[in-house]
Structure formats: C-alpha cells, structure tokens
C-alpha cells in the first residue's frame, strides 16, 4: 500500500528542510529555556509509532471502539507507572497538555464563576492559574497571591486572601519561581476555608519523581503536570490524585467526555516509556545534576552583578531581573539568540514593561544537563551570558560567544548517534 521509499525527504522537501534545520539548531544552540528538554530516542520512536492510527475513546477495558486490546496494555502501563513513580493512588494519562490537565482538574473541582486562588503571573505563576487572557481567568473568578520582599511565596498574603475570598480551589504551582514550595502550609490554608488544594508541578515533575524536590501528591487533593520539561517525556499532560473514589470519577469524566475525545495513544505510549526511564537510578543522578548546574549558573550571575529573583535557586530554574540594567528581556533574549544561546524573556516582580517586552530572563538547566553539561560548563556558560548582557550592542562579543557556544555543543551532541 505505502511504498517504503515514500519518505518526507523525497515527498515534501520544504517540510523536510525545516525539520532538518531545527535538528541542526537543537544540536548547535545551547538550550536554556526552563520548559524545554531533549527526549530520548525511545520517546521519539513511540511518538511516530502505529499507535497514532488507533481511536480509543474511553478508558482501558471501557472503550467505545473495538480493537483496543493492545492500546489498553500501553495505557495501563502508563497509568501504573505514573502511580508508582509519583506515589499516587490515581493517574489519568490522557490529557493532551498541562493546560488541558489544569482545565480538566478545574472542571472536576469547580463550577464556572467559582473562585480560584493562585500565584500571580508576574510573580512566577502561569497563564492557566487565572490570567484574564486564559480560560482560567474567563470562566473562574481568580484571586492572586505573590512573592514577599524576600522573594519567597507570601503565605501570609495567601492565607489572608483565602479568608477574604473563600476560594473553591487553592492552587500552588509556578512557571518561574526558583524556590521550594511549602505544600503542607498551603494544605493548611486550604483546610482553613474548606477549599480543595490543587498543585501544578509541571516544572518540577522530574525533580519530584527523582526525590530531589518535595512531593505534593499525597498532600494535595489533585496534582497536575506536564510530561516534558524536567520529566523528559513527550509534550503532554498528566493528572494525579490521592485516593478519593468520588473525585476520581469526576476527574475521569472531566477528561473524557468532558473536554477531550479520542486520546493520543502514541503519546500515551511515549509517556509510559518516559515514566520507566524516570524510574532508573541514572535519572536521579540527572535530576541532582540539574540542581547543581542551576546553582552554579545563578551564583556566577550574582557575582557578576545581576539580580536573581528570590536570591538564588533551589530547583531547575532562576529568574534574572534586568530592571536595574536598562535592558529589556526582549533585547536580552535576541542578543543571546544571536550567540546561539536560547532563553526566554519573562516578567519579574515590579514589572514595568509589557509581557511582550518584559524586564527579565528565565534560565533553566534541564536541557543542558541532558547534554552532559556539569558545573564547569554551566559556570562557563553563565559567564558568556553576562559578557553579552554587559555589552549588549557589541556584535564582536556576541560573535565570540557564538563561536564558543558552537564548540561547546560539539563536545556534547544530542542526537548525533541517530545520524
């Protein structure tokens, strides 16, 4: 039926060229975006498997289509491994993304118009934590806590807002906070107002799975996450919970048929193998190195005179405030990009610019750690970042750093073995 020679390269040269160029970019650029990583060849293989052909609405053993006996095995493996990896009593592996996992959890826990208490976006939260431009801020009444003067979560403010607004859900989680969340303290705040306690560990899921960051799974009512980022799986979502049969039914219904139809079985299989990878001893070593590399980079940038929000990092990322440098995040991102160093601009506490410009950078170490970078390379890289930010319009400095970055990437290839 299909000719084995019918490759993308021979059939669609334009698309093949774009993919080839992206492959080269990933090999020759230093990736410092905290939410990005490099998946294993196993994860890549499964995302391109024949499981993409199978419709499987429903759950293992309870499908609306025939012929699901083998995809049932794949999904059940993913469920069982997720529960084991995170110490959960319940796992739903069907969410297509972290944002959808959040939407589905909200659907199970709230009605439209109910109040959600979560972290402010400019202080490190996420769009789906009640931003007015997101469904989470359109369908629910969002109230936000932030960071205190020391750069830590302002638990007193959160407790005060909880008493004032009596939210239905209190959410703890972040996309740009470099500290450790006191999950138990949030649990106590939620209990004080009879609210559900939900956590979003999208950024630290791999660290939680490896045991190098505290787990909220048996503290919160519901935990959501992505399966990429530090977990190093496919781009997708996951919902976890401690035992609560009634809530489990509501979560399942919120995913299907509440907001999704047929699950992506090829992605679910990729999740299953990623969870197995995260159970291996070397994954814990990897997670520990992520933390070491982030600390090394943050320390260098502090020594070079840059303001690190929260004073440093205790996880995989840190936020650099450029408010006192007369540099926008947009300018910094572009200059570093010309040097083959990929970062993302980010809003910071006290932000004065628009979200499209910003006054900060978010820097993360999951991807460089996957490549094999250790503290030596991380520190060296931080110095190069500072060299560019110190003289942001100096194209010679940018060119010099680009050459160094290219050489460093050559020593730590990502997928060269696949060529």
Curated annotation (Swiss-Prot):
HAMAP family: SHMT
Similarity remark: Belongs to the SHMT family.
Job of this protein: Catalyzes the reversible interconversion of serine and glycine with tetrahydrofolate (THF) serving as the one-carbon carrier. This reaction serves as the major source of one-carbon groups required for the biosynthesis of purines, thymidylate, methionine, and other important biomolecules. Also exhibits THF-independent aldolase activity toward beta-hydroxyamino acids, producing glycine and aldehydes, via a retro-aldol mechanism.
Pathway annotation from the record: One-carbon metabolism; tetrahydrofolate interconversion; Amino-acid biosynthesis; glycine biosynthesis; glycine from L-serine: step 1/1
Subcellular location: Cytoplasm
Xref: PROSITE patterns: SHMT (PS00096)
Binding site for (6S)-5,6,7,8-tetrahydrofolate: 121, 125-127, 354-356
The keyword Iron-sulfur belongs to this UniProt entry's keyword annotation: no
Gene3D superfamilies: Aspartate Aminotransferase, domain 1 (3.90.1150.10), Type I PLP-dependent aspartate aminotransferase-like (Major domain) (3.40.640.10)
One Pfam family linked to the record: SHMT
Site, as annotated: Plays an important role in substrate specificity: 228
Naturally occurring in which organism (per UniProt): Coxiella burnetii (strain RSA 493 / Nine Mile phase I)
SUBUNIT field: Homodimer.
UniProt xrefs under InterPro entries: PyrdxlP-dep_Trfase, PyrdxlP-dep_Trfase_major, PyrdxlP-dep_Trfase_small, Ser_HO-MeTrfase, Ser_HO-MeTrfase-like, Ser_HO-MeTrfase_PLP_BS, SHMT-like_dom
PANTHER family per the UniProt record, alphabetical: SERINE HYDROXYMETHYLTRANSFERASE
Keywords: Amino-acid biosynthesis, Cytoplasm, One-carbon metabolism, Pyridoxal phosphate, Transferase
Keyword presence, Protease: no
One GO process term, biological-process aspect: tetrahydrofolate metabolic process
NCBIfam families: PRK00011.1
MF (Gene Ontology): glycine hydroxymethyltransferase activity; pyridoxal phosphate binding
EC number: 2.1.2.1
Signal peptide feature range: none
This protein's name: Serine hydroxymethyltransferase
Modified residues (N6-(pyridoxal phosphate)lysine): 229
Coiled-coil features, chain-numbered ranges: none
Entry cofactors: pyridoxal 5'-phosphate
Catalytic reaction equation(s): (6R)-5,10-methylene-5,6,7,8-tetrahydrofolate + glycine + H2O = (6S)-5,6,7,8-tetrahydrofolate + L-serine
């Amino acid at each position: 039926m299909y000719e084995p020679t019918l490759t993308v390269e021979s059939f669609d040269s334009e698309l093949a060229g774009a993919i080839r160029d992206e492959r080269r970019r990933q090999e020759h650029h230093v990736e410092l975006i905290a939410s990005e990583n490099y998946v294993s060849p196993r994860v890549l293989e499964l995302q391109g498997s024949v499981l993409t052909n199978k419709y499987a609405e429903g759950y293992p053993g309870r499908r609306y289509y025939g012929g699901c006996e083998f995809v049932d095995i794949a999904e059940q493996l993913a469920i069982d491994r997720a529960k084991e990896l995170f110490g959960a009593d319940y796992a739903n592996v069907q969410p297509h993304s972290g944002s959808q996992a959040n939407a589905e959890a909200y659907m199970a826990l709230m009605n439209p118009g109910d109040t959600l208490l979560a972290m402010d976006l400019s202080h490190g939260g996420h769009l789906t934590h009640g931003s007015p431009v997101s469904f989470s801020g359109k369908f629910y009444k969002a109230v936000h806590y932030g960071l205190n003067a020391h750069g830590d979560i302002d638990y007193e403010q959160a407790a005060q807002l909880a008493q004032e607004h009596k939210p239905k859900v209190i959410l703890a989680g972040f996309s740009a906070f470099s500290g450790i969340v006191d999950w138990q303290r949030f649990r106590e705040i939620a209990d004080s107002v009879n609210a559900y306690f939900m956590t979003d560990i999208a950024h630290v899921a791999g660290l939680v799975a490896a045991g190098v960051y505290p787990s909220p799974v048996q503290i919160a009512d519901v935990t959501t996450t992505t399966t990429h980022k530090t977990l190093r799986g496919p781009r997708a979502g996951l919902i976890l919970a401690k035992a609560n049969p009634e809530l489990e039914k509501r979560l399942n219904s919120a995913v299907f048929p509440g907001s999704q139809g047929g699950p992506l079985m090829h992605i679910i299989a990729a999740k299953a193998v990623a969870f197995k990878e995260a159970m291996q001893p070397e994954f814990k070593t990897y997670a520990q190195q992520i933390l070491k590399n982030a600390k090394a980079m943050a320390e260098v940038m502090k020594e070079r005179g840059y303001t690190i929000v929260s004073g440093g990092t205790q996880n995989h990322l840190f936020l650099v405030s450029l408010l006192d440098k007369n540099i926008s995040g947009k300018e910094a991102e572009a200059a570093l990009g010309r040097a083959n160093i990929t970062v993302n601009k980010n809003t910071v506490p006290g932000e004065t610019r628009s979200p499209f410009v910003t006054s900060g950078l978010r820097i993360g170490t999951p991807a460089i750690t996957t490549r094999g970078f250790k503290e030596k390379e991380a520190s060296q890289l931080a110095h190069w970042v500072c060299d560019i930010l110190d003289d942001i319009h100096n194209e010679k400095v940018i060119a010099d750093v680009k050459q160094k970055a290219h050489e460093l990437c050559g020593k730590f290839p990502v997928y060269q073995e696949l060529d």
